[in-house]
């Protein structure tokens, strides 16, 4: 889709957001004296290694729909990125996905050690809520409270963490006897629910955070939520397709691991062509959800197409 004449292209907007978030986190994660220096270094390794910064971008662009400048949305955006990065640190651990590479370089537990990686993830998790509680995030304590509650729900048992637990259960991790390690044959509806929790919840929070900062009306918040739900599902399908078709050097992490682990994915259930058709439908659904915002939502609409077409 063409960018609005008065707004930057999506590539420029994503790059600007990525640079701004990195600079903000660089200042927020201070290097302290030993033993804090090792912990801070591990937290910085997790957060300053690049990445698309898609979640902060969604916070900033959702807030922009209501006239909130990017610098005012940055604390909420950075807090969400802390949660995302913490989840990656813990997901990469041997007890979870056992990955050696992330964003083209060693994962935190490989660069440091498992104990430091666990604590670095914990540090990022708690830093996120420290950021949201600060009055620099928003002058209105009610808005800060709403942001904290929204992120806690999205990252917690009803969201990301619960989705990860369902994912592990689907791999047969908790079964006993001969069933241990045997993947479950989940129906498509169960896979969608799992992915909505594991991946979609944080993306929904991103748009909700922007709406909260912008004092959006209930109908406006509902429109953004419909967009985020569709984008969340599209993101996971695209991610699963990358695991099947991607190249490790481009993706920045190992590929082919989902099938090897017997992970439940819509690509496995629908096949590649069926998954691509569902991906196209979800992008159209995301675009339709933002129709009432007109050209102000151009970058958010472009982001949906970008998510579907990404190569890393």
Stretches with model-predicted labels:
Residues 1-30:
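N-terminal amphipathic/basic leader segments beginning at the initiator methionine
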